[in-house]
């Protein structure tokens, strides 16, 4: 078997995350696209940490002939909130992502409206704006600088993920991240403090929203 889908098959949703704990949450959070299930399928890809790892993983996942060649892509997992008042467990839906290089272009997320509505309808605290990329863990004064430059949150993989997805062909892209630490709630290590546990629970709860978004992309009136 080559793994190549039939030409008339709808592509599965590709959810990209960096960490094993993120992949665990996203795979445990709802229907996983198992054989025999109705509805669109989902592939959860662990890219590894950092922008270079994300770019490599996406290039391989979206290569010609792969099952996910034409897939819409969501970058998900945890992030650091930059705005005062953000708390662990808040959700960030990117209006655009921008890489860590000074002249990096923005990747707009034009299909994020249904995600915003569905997450808010679930009673989650949702922030929307620029999701900035970094190649290292951002703390202290650097966070304040990124926020002053217009970003609402930062992580290491979303911008690289969506940039690689768009480079591989036109497709819907989105970035949905859960705040694991924020200016007033800095996290020392994921899973060891209350904020990390709260963020994990929220991340686990958002997968049904991703399914709904994927289904909306398949509607004939789009």
Language model feature labels by segment:
Residues 2-11, 67:
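Extreme N-terminus of proteins, especially the signal/transit-peptide cleavage junction
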Residues 15-16, 77:
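Intrinsically disordered, low-complexity regions
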């Amino acid at each position: 078997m080559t793994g190549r889908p039939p030409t008339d098959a709808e592509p599965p949703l590709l959810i990209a995350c960096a960490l094993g704990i993120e992949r665990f949450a996203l795979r445990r959070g709802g229907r996983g696209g198992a054989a025999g299930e109705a509805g669109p399928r989902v592939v959860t890809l662990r890219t590894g940490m950092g922008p270079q790892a994300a770019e490599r993983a996406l290039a391989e996942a979206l290569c010609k002939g792969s099952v996910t060649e034409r897939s819409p892509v969501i970058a998900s997992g945890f992030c650091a909130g930059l705005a005062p008042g953000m708390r662990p467990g808040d959700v960030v839906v990117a209006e655009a992502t921008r890489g860590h290089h000074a002249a990096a272009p923005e990747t707009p997320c034009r299909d994020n409206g249904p995600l915003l509505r569905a997450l808010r309808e679930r009673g989650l605290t949702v922030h929307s704006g620029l999701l900035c990329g970094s190649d290292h863990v951002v703390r202290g004064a650097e966070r304040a600088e990124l926020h002053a430059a217009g970003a609402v949150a930062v992580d290491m993989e979303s911008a690289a993920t969506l940039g690689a997805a768009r480079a591989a062909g036109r497709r819907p892209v989105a970035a949905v991240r859960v705040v694991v630490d924020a200016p007033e709630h800095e996290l020392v290590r994921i899973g060891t403090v209350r904020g990390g546990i709260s963020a994990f629970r929220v991340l686990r709860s958002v997968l049904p929203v991703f399914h709904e978004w994927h289904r909306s992309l398949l509607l004939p009136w789009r």
